[in-house]
Amino acid sequence: MKRSSFDAGLDGRQQDRRHSAVPDERPTPLKISKARACAECKRHKIRCEFRPGETSCTKCLRSGIKCVVNDFSQKFVDDDGVWKARASATIQQLQAAVSHLLRQNGLPELSTYTVGDSPNGPSPAAPSYHTGNRHSMNGSPSDVKPDGPGLVVTREPSQEPDLQDRELVPAPMRSLYEVTKLRDLRHNHIEQPKSTLLEEDFLSRGLISLQEAEELFAYFSRTMNQLLWGGIILVHRDLTSVRRASSLLAAAVLTVAALHIPNRTETLNLCYSEYVSLVSSMSLTRAHTLDDVRALCVGAFWLSELSWKLSGHAVRIATELGLHQSYQKMIRGHSDQYERAQLWYLLYVCDHHFSIAYGRPPVIHEDQAIKNYETFLQAPMVVPGDIRLLAQVALFMILTEAYRTFGSDTEQALTEEDFGQLRVFNVAIDQWRLLWQPRSEYLTLAAADSPYVRTYPSKGVVLHYHFAKFQLNSLSLRALSPTNTPVFSMDRKESANIAISSAMACLNMVLEEQDIRDAIVGVPIFTHTMVTFSALFLLKVAVNWNSAYLSLDSGLVRSLVERVIELLNCVSAGERHLTRHIARGLSKMLERFDSWDMSNGVPAGTVGERAGSGVPGGANAMAQGFPPPDLIYDMVGTYGFGLDENLLDPSMANFEYLAQ
C-alpha cells in the first residue's frame, strides 16, 4: 500500500520550501494553466495530441473538422505580452521626447531626476502643483484647442474632500470644486514665472531690436513709472527681468514708451499689436501672475482706447488671485502680502479712474482694505509712493459716495434739498486736502532726486483737489437749460460758481506750475481727462449762461483754453498721443465758440460783458443774448458723473460730436 505524501512528510517539506522562498507578506503568484486541448477533444474527454508542424490535433484531422483551442488562460498570457511590448515602446518614445525637451531648454539629463521611494509620495498620475501646473501665457491649457467642438471637463486626480477641514463655511464654488475636483472650477493660484519665457517672446522673434527695446524701457522707468506713485507699478529694474516675468508686461511698457516718444510710430504699431494680441490670448486662460495684472494696469493708465476694458479685466484677474484678501493676511503678520495688498489699492484707483469719471458704477467696493488704508500706511515696508497712492484712494472714496448719492442720470436735476448733502461732500474734500497736502510735502523731498518728478507729488494733490471740487459742484447745472430755468437759488448759484472757479484753477495749475507743465505728457490719461473736462465745461457754460447767472468771465475762459491748446501742441510726444487729439478737438471747439460770438455782433472774448443788467431766467433768456436753441452747446457729458467716454477716443479726432 502506497503512502500518501502527507503520511510520508513530503507535504510539510514542500510547504517549508514554499515559505522559505516566498516571504509571508507577499501573496503566492497565480499558476496559469498551459493546457491546449481543443474543444472537440474536451467534449469527448480524450487526449488532444498535435503532430509537429500541424495546427490541428490528430482527432480533428481524422474527423475533418476545424480544431479550435479554447484556452483563455493562454490567450491572457499572449495578450499581456503584446500590451507590455507596446507599453515599453511608448515609454521609450516618451523618454526620448523628454530628453529632447531637456536638451532644448538646457536642463539636466533625464537620468538625474530621481523618484522618491516614499509610499506616500505623489504618483506620476497626480503631480503636485509646483511640477504640474506651470504654464506660460502661450502654453496654458486654455490655449490647447481640442480636436472637435464641445466642452472638455476634466477631473483632478487629487484627494477626496477632507471632512475635518477647519474652514467650515468656504465659498460655494470652492465647495463645488472640493466635491467634483473639476479643474474648470478650481480657484486660480499664482503661477511662477517661466524660466524660458525670454527665449520665446516677441523680442526674441525680432519684432523690434533689443537696443530699441532697452531705450524704451529706460525711458518708461525714469518718466511715466516715476510719475505713477513713485514707480510702484513696475518693480523690475531691467528689461531682462521684465521679459522673464511676463511678456505681457514687457509689451505694455514698450507700447506706452513708444507712444510718448516722437517719431516712433512704426515701433508703436508693432508693440501695440503684440500687446493687444497677448491680452486677447490671455483673456480666457487660467494661469496669471501679478505682473500680468500690472501689465493690464499699465495699458489702462495710458492707452485711452483700451482703458475701460483693461481696468475691468485686471480687477477680475486680481480677485481670482485673491488680492482682495491680501490686506487681512498682511495685518495678521504675513509681511509677504504687502506687495499684493499694494496692488489691490492700485487697482482700486485704476478702476475709479475709468468708472466715476464716466458715470459708471465702479467694480471694487469699499471693503475693509479700502476703509482701513491708514492701517496699511503704518506697515514698516511702506514707501513714499504708497502715500501718493492712498491719497487718491481716500479721495475716490468721497467721490464714490457722492456718485451713489446723486447718481449719473443726466436728466435728473438736483433738488434744493440735495444741496445740503452736497455741502457735506464739499467739506469732506476740503478736509482731504488739509490731511494729504502736508503729507505730500514729505513726498516732494523724497522725489527731489528725480529730475522728472520734482514737486509733482505735492502739486498733484492740489490738482486733484480742484478737479474733485469741480466734478462734484458741476452737478448743480445738471439737466438745466437757460431757456426754461427760473432764477437760480442761492445754493445752486453758489455751487455752480464753485464748479467754475475749480475748473479754472485746474487749467491755471497746468499752465502756471512748471513741474506740472513738464509732466503733462507723461501723466496717466485721467489727468488729461481733468484738463479736457474743465476746458470743455467752461466753454459750454460761457455760451449757455451769461454773467447775470454766474460769475464767469468768458474772455478769461477763452484765453485759458487757447493757452491749454498751445501747451498740448508743444509737448514732445508721438503723433498718436492723446494730447494731440485733445488739442485738435479743443481748437475746433474754440472756433465754434468764436463763430457764435461773432454772429451776435460782439468781439470775441466779451461775451460775459453784455446784458449784465438783465434779469435772467425763463422767456427773458433770448433777450439777454442767449444763443438760439439750435446753437446751444449740449451740456450733457460735461459735468458731474457723466463725462462722455468719446471725449478721450483718438478715433474721434475731429471732435465734431462735441459741438452738436
Curated annotation (Swiss-Prot):
Primary site of residence: nucleus
Q: List the disulfide bonds.
A: none
Keyword terms, alphabetized: DNA-binding, Metal-binding, Nucleus, Transcription, Transcription regulation, Zinc
GO CC, alphabetical: nucleus
In terms of PROSITE patterns, this protein maps to: ZN2_CY6_FUNGAL_1, ZN2_CY6_FUNGAL_2
Q: Which residues bind DNA?
A: 38-67
- What superkingdom heads the lineage? Eukaryota
> What's a Gene Ontology MF term here?
DNA-binding transcription factor activity, RNA polymerase II-specific
| BP GO terms, sorted | DNA-templated transcription
Quote the biased-composition stretches of kind Basic and acidic residues, using this chain's numbering. 13-28
Region span, Disordered: 1-28, 112-163
Q: Which InterPro entries match?
A: prtT, Transcription_factor_dom_fun, Zn2-C6_fun-type_DNA-bd_sf, Zn2Cys6_DnaBD
Regarding protein family, the annotation reads: Belongs to the prtT family.
Q: What is this protein called?
A: Transcriptional activator of proteases prtT
Species lineage: Eukaryota, Fungi, Dikarya, Ascomycota, Pezizomycotina
